[in-house]
A protein has these predicted regions:
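Cytosolic/nucleoplasmic, non-transmembrane interface domains of endomembrane
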Residues: 1-29
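Cytosolic/matrix-facing juxtamembrane and C-terminal tails of multi-pass cellular membrane proteins
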Residues: 44-51, 87-157
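Sequence-level detector for tyrosine residue identity
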Residues: 3-4, 24, 70-73, 108, ...
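Transmembrane alpha-helical hairpins and terminal membrane-anchor modules
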Residues: 57-105, 109
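Transmembrane alpha-helical segments and their cytosolic interface motifs
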Residues: 19-79
Length: 157
C-alpha cells in the first residue's frame, strides 16, 4: 500500500524500482550509482535511449498543453492539444516507462554479481541467501559498517 503513486506511470517506475529489492535485496536507489559504471556500454546505451524516449514523451505532453495557449488564434488549438496530451499520457508515456523499467530490472538481473565483485563483497552462495546478502550490501553502502563480517574478497589480479 505504501508503494502506490497517483499515476500509472509512477506506479510502473516504482514497480521497476522495487523489483530488485524484492528479488535480490538490493535497493535500487542506493545501489544504482555503483552499478551504472559497471554496466557494459551496450546496456548503458540502451538505458540512455529508453530514458531519452521517456523524457521526449513527457516533453511532448508539456508542449501539447502549451499549444492550447494559441486558442485566441484558432479554436482547434484546445481539442488538438488535449487529444495529443491525452494520447501521450495514457499510451505513450506508460509504454516507454515500462521499457525503461524493464531495462533497469534487466541490469540488476544480469549484472548484480559484477556489483558484488567490484565492491569486493562476497557473492551469495545460494539463491536463498541472496536476498539477505543484498540487504546487507545495501545497508553497508547506505550507512557503512564497523562489523567484522562479511570479509571482503580479494580483487582479481
Amino acid at each position: 500500500p505504501g508503494y502506490y503513486l497517483p499515476t500509472r506511470t509512477g506506479n510502473i517506475l516504482r514497480a521497476a524500482e522495487r523489483r530488485p529489492a524484492d528479488k535480490y535485496g538490493l535497493d535500487t536507489i542506493i545501489c544504482w550509482p555503483r552499478l551504472w559504471p559497471a554496466l557494459p556500454d551496450t546496456h548503458r546505451t540502451d538505458l540512455l535511449a529508453a530514458r531519452t524516449s521517456l523524457d521526449t514523451a513527457a516533453t511532448t505532453t508539456l508542449w501539447a498543453l502549451l499549444f492550447s495557449a494559441y486558442t485566441p488564434y484558432t479554436l482547434l488549438a484546445i481539442p488538438l492539444a488535449l487529444a495529443i496530451a491525452t494520447l501521450t499520457v495514457t499510451l505513450v508515456i506508460p509504454s516507454r516507462a515500462q521499457a525503461f523499467g524493464d531495462l533497469i530490472e534487466a541490469a540488476y538481473d544480469t549484472h548484480r554479481t559484477t556489483l558484488y565483485t567490484q565492491l569486493r563483497w562476497p557473492l551469495p552462495s545460494t539463491p536463498a541467501d541472496e536476498k539477505a546478502a543484498g540487504q546487507a550490501l545495501t545497508a553497508y553502502l547506505w550507512r557503512g559498517s564497523d562489523h567484522t563480517t562479511p570479509t571482503f574478497t580479494q580483487p582479481n589480479p
